[in-house]
């Protein structure tokens, strides 16, 4: 099963529809690039042909393409290694004129530690690269000002309904789909300027029967919901991509959850090649969901839904008969069975983070494994008591960290000693706070207090000695 948006991706800029002005500006930028050597930012809404136009441009010019998008990690090191090296080495290995097109997709989505230093590295790259560079963005002003100022800007606008309909008509002719004009108009209207989504909907509705009427088009608000098991019947147990897409809109589940349900249950009904095709569609859906997580652009949910619903249904070739018992995703069952363990882990990590002033992730991934080794089965009792005192751990959490039995006397005595240490430390702190209120003429009491304080300081020092050895 071939994705029609890929099958009919424009091979030349002349085939790009709905953005003639932007298309011509991109062609002019490429033709004059040796004179100005500027990078260009192509920006606009999702699904209107920005990335396709960049690939079509490279095809026209005979340039190879090196691409980085939001599915890739884009730290400074990665940008330098992949895009930077490609830009510098293109003169030796590239296509026409020895050039490569460096394509940085979703350039407006560089996030925190995930893409650490990526924006600065891209800015340096566009300033110095001896190869043409195209940056693609949905939100132009989400890019850094320094990066915007270093590039030429070309805006792609939403594709109008009258531009979408001829594209759908052309796809129908190539795919031998009999169609009603009103159906194409309805798809174009429904997809509000998103050409890619319009082609996806056309494929979902027309691929099976090769006919398309206005009544077939899913339109308007859906005012009913169905259960997830009904949805699985519509997607897995039938051949109709159209019904599967309708069911996906009717069921009250997110695309992430639908993917989990279908991925776990489709092997119960599909065989051989049809199973392989179904998993290819699920893989495509997962790619789109990854882009949602990377960019927080939930418009991409639509493309994931097309794959996980209509794509999987279209992959079915045979009716295997019988009744299939569907069940919830095994991943969810595993999460349920491990919930108690995860709750204990997070409790300990939270107390470590609050005490040490680090993040939960650092506490969970770096500090906690270290503590487990040092306190394994409570063999180093002093350290285990110090840990329990410092992080205020009770019996179940000491047992979790050390791997010891929760009901053993050893763990109970460690928790009791830790509680005593915390109490002693609190008393010592309170006495220090009121030391100035002791009467000057009560020298005997002062001496006694001094002795007590000295003893408590020794105890306080003991309570910290074990923790010092952790760090």
UniProtKB/Swiss-Prot annotation:
Heteromultimer composed of small subunits (RfcS) and large subunits (RfcL). Pfam families: AAA, RCF1-5-like_lid. CDD domains: AAA, HLD_clamp_RFC. One of its GO terms (biological process) is DNA replication. This is Replication factor C large subunit. Residues 422-431 have a biased composition (Basic and acidic residues). Residues 442-460 have a biased composition (Acidic residues). Residues 422-471 are annotated as: Disordered. Keywords: ATP-binding, DNA replication, Nucleotide-binding. ATP binds at residues 44-51. Coiled coil: none annotated. Belongs to the activator 1 small subunits family. RfcL subfamily. One of its GO terms (molecular function) is DNA clamp loader activity. InterPro entries: AAA+_ATPase (IPR003593), ATPase_AAA_core (IPR003959), P-loop_NTPase (IPR027417), Rep_factor-C_lsu (IPR023935), RFC_lid (IPR047854). Signal peptide: none annotated. SMART domains: AAA (SM00382). Part of the RFC clamp loader complex which loads the PCNA sliding clamp onto DNA.
């Amino acid at each position: 099963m071939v994705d029609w948006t890929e099958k009919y991706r424009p091979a030349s800029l002349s085939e790009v529809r709905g953005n003639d002005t932007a298309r011509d500006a991109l062609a002019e930028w490429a033709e004059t690039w040796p004179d100005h050597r500027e990078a260009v930012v192509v920006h606009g809404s999702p699904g209107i042909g920005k990335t396709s136009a960049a690939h079509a441009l490279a095809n026209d010019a005979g340039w190879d393409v090196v691409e980085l998008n939001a599915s890739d990690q884009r730290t400074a090191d990665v940008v330098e290694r992949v895009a930077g090296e490609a830009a510098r080495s293109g003169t030796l290995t590239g296509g026409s004129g020895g050039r490569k097109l460096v394509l940085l997709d979703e350039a407006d989505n560089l996030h925190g530690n995930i893409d650490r230093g990526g924006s600065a590295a891209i800015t340096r790259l566009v300033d110095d690269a001896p190869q043409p560079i195209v940056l693609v963005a949905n939100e132009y002003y989400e890019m850094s000002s320094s990066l915007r100022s270093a590039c030429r800007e070309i805006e792609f606008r939403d594709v109008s309904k009258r531009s979408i309909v001829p594209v759908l008509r052309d796809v129908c002719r190539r795919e031998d789909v009999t169609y009603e004009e009103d159906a194409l108009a309805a798809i174009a209207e429904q997809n509000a300027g998103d050409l890619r989504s319009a082609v996806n909907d056309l494929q979902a509705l027309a691929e099976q029967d090769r006919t398309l009427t206005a009544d077939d088009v899913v339109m308007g608000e859906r005012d009913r919901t169905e259960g997830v098991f009904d949805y699985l019947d519509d997607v897995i147990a039938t051949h109709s991509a159209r019904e599967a897409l309708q069911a996906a809109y009717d069921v009250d589940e997110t695309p992430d959850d639908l993917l989990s349900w279908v991925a776990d249950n489709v092997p119960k009904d599909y065989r051989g090649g049809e199973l392989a095709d179904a998993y290819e569609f699920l893989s495509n859906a997962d790619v789109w969901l990854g882009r949602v997580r990377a960019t927080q652009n939930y418009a991409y949910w639509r493309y994931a839904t097309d794959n996980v619903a209509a794509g999987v249904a279209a992959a079915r070739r045979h009716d295997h008969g019988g009744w299939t018992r569907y069940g919830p995703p095994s991943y969810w069952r595993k999460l349920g069975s491990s919930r108690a363990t995860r709750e204990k882990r997070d409790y300990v990590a939270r107390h470590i983070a609050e005490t040490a002033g680090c993040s939960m992730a650092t506490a969970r991934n770096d500090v906690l494994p270290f503590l487990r080794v040092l306190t394994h089965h409570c063999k180093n009792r002093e350290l285990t008591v110090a840990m329990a005192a410092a992080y205020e751990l009770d019996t179940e959490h000491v047992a979790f960290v050390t791997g010891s039995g929760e009901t053993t006397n050893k763990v109970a005595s460690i928790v009791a000693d830790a509680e005593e240490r915390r109490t002693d430390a609190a008393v010592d702190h309170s006495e220090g706070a009121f030391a100035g209120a002791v009467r000057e003429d009560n020298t005997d009491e002062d001496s006694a207090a001094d002795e007590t304080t000295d003893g408590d300081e020794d105890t306080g020092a003991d309570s910290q000695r074990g923790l010092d050895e952790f760090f």
